[in-house]
């Protein structure tokens, strides 16, 4: 290989190394260190220092986080990723939250770079609310607090980053997700409540369940209670793995067949919200890796009405301790999905995508 060819190869490798961080910062505008430290694959410290040193990224600010420079946006355009340069804002905290969700999706292999409902309706990806608000003639969100939308088959989840003190116009949020679902031809809707951890997201909901404030203006807890689905997401690598599995079409069926018995007979047994019967305990079980609080509650009601003494929640290993706190024994039991079924599920999804 000639010297010129080697130089081009080195430049290509450098560009590929820079690209995830540059695209994510350019897209989200402000990303804080709390987020970047949780995703070192994209934002390792040596890379960030290099980007600052070469004038692509501004020095880190506790107030505004990581931001691209004019040269940074120019670099993206040169590499066929043109983006609107940053406009100064005092709402950087909200941008930090938006970025945490977008980066988690990116780490899960879900593109957060959708910019219109039309584009989003054709692909099962993630549509950030900030991209919709920035688009011309796309003011479909108004003053809604939604962070973004993700399609999982026929289900549309509206992502929110809840705060206990933040008030929600309940019907307006419901109307928003229903309207987007109709435009995307989704038949089911729900919410994805995001936070730095499962605990922080759940605490915001719990506060709202305790302190009701009215019919129109409510809390995130009320929003969750009125939903068909209320999933929790931790904005880190664990949450990214959760989303990666949730995105696999009909993932519950193959897992149910690998983990238990009678997976095709739940409706006849009066347990339509359950997934299978545990072969050892002979009790109904539900796959809970999606952390769907509403689904778990429905399954619990059905199991009790059918006369069972337990409902088994089968989840990922890092979800177990949290689930044990909010769904305690003796009625609830928490099981862990072994690595082998997870591996087979991922292998099947990889083959199907080829």
Residue locations for each model-derived region?
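Short, Lys/Arg-enriched N-terminal segment that forms or immediately precedes the first helix
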Residues: 1-10, 82-85
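Short amphipathic alpha-helical interface segments
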Residues: 5-38
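Ser/Thr-centered flexible coil motifs
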Residues: 14-15, 69, 166-170
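Short, basic interhelical loop/turn and adjoining N-cap
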Residues: 37-46
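Short amphipathic alpha-helical segments
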Residues: 43, 92-97, 165-173
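Accessory beta->alpha helical hairpin/"wing" motif in late/C-terminal subdomains of nucleic-acid enzymes
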Residues: 48-83
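Amphipathic alpha-helical dimerization/coiled-coil segments
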Residues: 83-117
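Electrostatic, structured charged patches in enzyme active sites and in nucleic-acid/phosphate-binding
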Residues: 103-354
């Amino acid at each position: 290989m000639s010297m010129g060819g080697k130089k081009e190869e080195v430049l290509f490798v450098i560009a590929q190394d820079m690209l995830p961080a540059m695209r994510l910062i350019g897209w989200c505008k402000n990303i804080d260190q709390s987020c970047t430290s949780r995703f070192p694959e994209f934002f390792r410290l040596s890379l960030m220092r290099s980007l600052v040193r070469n004038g692509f990224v501004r020095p880190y600010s506790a107030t505004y986080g990581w931001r691209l420079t004019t040269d940074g946006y120019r670099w993206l355009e040169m590499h066929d990723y043109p983006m609107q340069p940053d406009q100064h804002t005092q709402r950087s905290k909200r941008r930090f939250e938006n970025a945490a969700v977008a980066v988690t999706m990116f780490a899960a292999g879900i593109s957060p770079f959708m910019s219109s409902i039309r584009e989003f309706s054709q692909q099962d990806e993630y549509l950030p609310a900030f991209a919709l608000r920035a688009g011309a003639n796309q003011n479909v969100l108004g003053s809604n607090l939604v962070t973004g939308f993700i399609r999982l088959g026929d289900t549309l989840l509206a992502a929110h980053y809840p705060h206990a003190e933040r008030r929600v116009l309940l019907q307006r949020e419901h109307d928003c997700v229903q309207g987007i679902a109709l435009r995307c031809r989704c038949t089911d809707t729900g919410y994805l409540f995001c936070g730095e951890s499962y605990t922080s997201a759940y605490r915001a909901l719990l506060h709202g369940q305790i302190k009701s404030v009215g019919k129109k203006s409510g809390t995130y807890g009320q929003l969750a209670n009125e939903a068909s689905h209320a999933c929790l997401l931790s904005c880190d690598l664990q949450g990214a793995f959760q989303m990666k599995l949730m995105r696999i079409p009909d993932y519950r069926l193959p897992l149910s067949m690998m983990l238990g018995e009678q997976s095709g007979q739940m409706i006849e047994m009066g347990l339509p919200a359950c997934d299978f019967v545990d072969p050892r305990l002979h009790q109904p079980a539900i796959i809970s890796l999606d952390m769907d609080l509403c689904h778990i509650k429905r399954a619990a009601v059905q199991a009790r009405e059918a006369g069972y003494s337990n409902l088994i929640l089968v989840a990922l290993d890092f979800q177990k301790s949290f689930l044990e706190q909010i769904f305690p024994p003796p009625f609830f039991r928490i099981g862990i999905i072994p690595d082998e079924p997870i591996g087979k599920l991922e292998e099947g999804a990889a083959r199907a995508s080829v």
